[in-house]
Structure formats: C-alpha cells, structure tokens
Amino acid sequence: EVVLKYYARPEELAEAAAIIFGSPTYYHDITLPIKQVMEEAAKANVMLKGKIGAAFGSYGWSGEATKQVLEVLKNRFGMTLVEPPIAVLYEPNKEQLEQCRKLGKTVAEKIAGK
C-alpha cells in the first residue's frame, strides 16, 4: 500500500517499509519542513536502519537538496538508498515524470525483495 503524506510525524516513519522524500532546493538546502521531520526523527531515535530511502525534488539554480536528503538518510539513519535522486530544473518534462514513476517502481520492487 502506498500512502502519500504531506507531513509525517517522526514515529510514523518507523512504520513505513520505504520513505521517498520530496524537497525542492531552497537557498542551496533542503526545505525547512523536511529538515524538521528528519531532525525530530533523529532526536526521537526513530529506527530507520535498513529501510529503503529515496529522494526527488526541483530546483532553480543549484539542485543539491536531493543529494543532501540521501546523505542524511544514509549517514544518520542507515537507510538503504535508491540512487540517483531525481532533481528537476523547475518543472518535470515527460521523461522526468517517467523517471519518477521508475523510481517508485524500483522502491516497490526493493520492498517486495525483487
């Protein structure tokens, strides 16, 4: 079952088999709401080790937020990553939307153990 959330409490992250974070790059960084969830999860010692993590996002000029998200998921939480992250300049085109679908499919296959 796929559940789309615009906000998740840190303890809800532990219930998921996989987490895909979406964050635009804002002033060369992850957006504050995504950062807050990660920081709250870290403070609460939410166990995400071995869970599957991925990231996507948009940017206007720099685009590093998706890589930063993956760094936190790997280094702080010990998650298994699906790489590379998807970073899109402004709005996705048809090919980039297809990349997003493939990312979702890859995550689902990893959950299923394929």
Where does each model-flagged region fall?
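Acidic, amphipathic alpha-helical patches
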Residues: 9-10
